[in-house]
């Protein structure tokens, strides 16, 4: 079954005290396919798909702007870690990680649009942007210092809402157009049945399908089985396609 909801997601990772790992990392993904990357070692935004080279034909300054955006985010998250440390009663060096993700979703059938933005600190939820109200909600008391800062800047929050529901969607559609032959392709799976022993569950394995939106079910006649079935996750293959399985308990 083909997905109709497309996504553009940005992932930022800012750490302190983590050895042998970039202090800052940014990854951009379209429909869960990585399209660009930047980190504090290279300090340069770079494409991760060949078709992303097409962007500069229409926009020669694209990669310079992306690099500037990512490096600006690094400075922002540097400051946030320093602001948060006292709130969590943290002193000295130590290992600390600030992560954030934001982006948008677009349904190419219903045309419905959604946006999201959230941040986490040391592996726990910290802030979440409420799109409809255009406000930040703190997931824990220590995040209030950042939440208040956001609420005081109402214009900035409205600007974020506009970005997530307009500009982000504009770029999502643009990336989909650039990578249409890859992102919008369809590949059917090969399907096999596996059983270790006569008393073992029978596993239905489907692999090699693209895109990754799919369902796999066992049926008895027209009835879909649920209680007897243990479904597996959709997992990526090395060649960019996907696989999934569902085990049927015969006992």
Regions found by a protein language model. Name each.
Residues 1-199, 203-207, 229, 239-249:
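Extracellular/lumenal regions of secretory-pathway proteins
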Residues 208-216:
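Solvent-exposed loop segments of extracellular immunoglobulin-like
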Residues 216-222:
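Conserved aromatic beta-strand anchor motif in extracellular beta-sandwich/beta-rich domains
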Residues 221, 250-251:
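Solvent-exposed, well-ordered amphipathic alpha-helical segments
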Residues 223-229:
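Short aromatic-acidic-glycine turn motif
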Residues 234-237:
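Conserved blade-ending motifs and adjacent loop-strand segments that build the rim/top face
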